[in-house]
């Protein structure tokens, strides 16, 4: 399922301002970590913008999970409009724009794993 062809089809299905998000597993399990690297490499070779972000999900194995973000147009941090979000006056128990930005700042070991497949 998660082949270059699959991600190419996702790319083609999206409009110019479309965003694709996918699960990438936990980096603490070797098999998941390698799958994350393969997936990131394929997505990064398909989309102009590709980033990995993190979340703590206690019901998932290891409680620490990675996701992929890909877009033809939008950068998940640089294009975040905090003022527009604030203007919505939505009160959430979890999401904040600070948390949004922070999710994309990865620990050194993950940055190294991603750099291995980006080079």
Predicted regions and their residues:
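Alpha-helix capping and helix-loop boundary segments enriched in small/acidic/polar residues
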Residues: 1, 30-31
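A short glycine-rich, Lys/Arg-flanked "PGG" loop and its adjoining helix->strand segment in the class I
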Residues: 2-16, 44
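Conserved beta-strand signature within the Rossmann-like core of class I S-adenosyl-L-methionine
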Residues: 17-24
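Conserved Class I S-adenosyl-L-methionine
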Residues: 7-8, 33-56, 68-70
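Short acidic/glycine-enriched loop/turn segments that link adjacent beta-strands
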Residues: 61-63
């Amino acid at each position: 399922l998660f082949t270059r062809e699959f991600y190419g089809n996702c790319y083609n299905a999206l409009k110019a301002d479309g965003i694709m998000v996918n699960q990438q597993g936990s980096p603490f399990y070797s098999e998941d970590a390698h799958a994350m690297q393969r997936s990131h490499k394929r997505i990064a070779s398909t989309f102009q913008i590709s980033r990995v972000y993190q979340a703590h999900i206690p019901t998932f194995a290891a409680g620490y999970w990675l996701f992929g973000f890909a877009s033809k147009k939008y950068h998940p941090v640089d294009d975040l409009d905090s003022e527009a979000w604030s203007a919505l006056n939505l009160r959430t128990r979890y999401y904040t724009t600070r948390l949004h930005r922070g999710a994309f700042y990865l620990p050194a070991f993950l940055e190294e794993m991603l750099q291995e497949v980006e080079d």
